[in-house]
Every structure is written in C-alpha cells, then in structure tokens.
A protein has these predicted regions:
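DUTPase catalytic domain/fold
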Residues: 1-153
C-alpha cells in the first residue's frame, strides 16, 4: 500500500473500507462573485441560485510524481442541487485543495461549516506520450459517433 503524506485540520478517512476516496470538508469559502468579493463568510453560508464559490478544504497533499488526485462530487451533496466541479490535483502542486461549487437550483441553499463537500481519489498515473497524427483510425464499433449515439434509452 502506498502511503501519501497530507496536512489538514482534520483526519482524512474513508467512510467504508472498500471506498475509493476520502471525504473532504468545507473549511472556509472564497467568494469569487465580483459583487461579493472581500465579504466575510458567515456561518452557515447561503449559496445563491447559479452562484459559484470556491470551498477551501484545509487539505494539502504531498503526492509522489507518479500519482494524481481527483476531486469528485459526493452523491449526497449532488442530491441537493449542488454541482461540485471535477478537478485534478497534479503531483507538483503543494497548495490548499480548493473545490469549485455551483448552486444549480433556483433556490438558495445553506452550506454548513465543516460539511463534507467532495471526495479525493488518489490514483497512480500511467505514463503516456501523445503523438500528433495527420489521421486517426476510426475503424471501431463506435467510430466518430458522439452524443446520443447509443439511443435514448
């Protein structure tokens, strides 16, 4: 088992032994809306309809060069109409992990301090080299068929 060093004001742990990721919490909020910039976060924080914020997690990782960390939404927060944007933490990054969060509903939603907001999944990277080509082989069962190509249901 690979050990990854981290710094955080709380313990990172899996909910269940078989889980892929560890939960991270809202530690503070950065208001990126120009009208609200510089205002203090008041507990609980009300995220307005269509508002995007950056939720700081208080978590710093020391990833080995051949690892990455994926920031993924938690299903429970998604049920509330909160979109947690997928993100990647590269191995060379040593800053605080921040999660972009958007309220996609037409009503205000409360975010509590220390609320679980996302999960971190740490993966070993496979080394790849992208080679530019003039042609791409389209001879697969799918070919270039994109959105909706498998039908509605």
């Amino acid at each position: 088992m690979k050990e990854i060093r981290y710094k955080a004001p709380y313990r990172l742990k899996k909910g269940y032994k078989s889980d892929s990721g560890v939960d991270v919490k809202i530690w503070s909020i950065d208001l990126i809306d120009e009208k609200l910039k510089g205002k203090k976060w008041v507990d609980p924080y009300i995220i307005l309809p269509n508002q995007t914020i950056h939720a700081q997690t208080g978590v710093y990782l020391e990833l080995p060069e051949d690892y990455e960390c994926q920031v993924r939404p938690k299903s429970g927060i998604s049920k509330q109409g909160i979109l947690v944007h997928f993100g990647t933490v590269d191995s060379g990054f040593r800053g605080e992990i921040t999660v972009a969060v958007t309220n996609v509903t037409n009503k205000a939603i409360e975010l509590e301090p220390r609320q679980k907001i996302a999960q971190l999944v740490i993966k070993k990277k496979d080394p790849v080299e992208l080679i530019r080509a003039d042609e791409i082989d389209l001879d697969t069962d799918r070919g270039a068929k994109g959105y909706g190509s498998t039908g509605k249901f």
